[in-house]
């Protein structure tokens, strides 16, 4: 499953690069487009949809997709694309440094180490409460950058990115599963729903922090979340 999930995201990334080239986007816009059109909100929104439609038992598939298909690729290939789009020099050392010093990656390794020790309950509760505020705070930060007068800025790029991410790629994946595996198994349905998630908040934050185009990143988040109410419903109904 891990290699399959990674393959799906890499295919999405390759397709977004081709579409971006067809649109003749400059390097800055192309990098932003690739990040937004590839990485989905597979945890915060994805887990909520999985829990609502298929139950908590199947969140584990979403978790595997989120870690290996979203998180690890975002902090590796995604960081490379962001620095490339901004025109910075890329090297194995600089990319490795960015990955290792990326706060979520640091916490990932600390968590692995912490599993060998008995953590006091109050610390666990505190970290859980702090963790639950991550996405809301990120959304507030994004919202503060959103200007209504610019809501339709770069709309031709934003709309193509959202359609590619939430409609075209999920349909291709769905048809592939239908041909090779069938779509009756719940893990297949969960995978398709994860693929169809709107653009990832953290990806947009990293894109903005890395100096990529704010308007494309922010407007794609807004349009993606709104569109997901309809697109995810249609996918779930078809898969039912």
What are these regions (language model features)?
Residues 1-240:
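Alpha-helical transmembrane segments of multi-pass small-molecule/ion transporters
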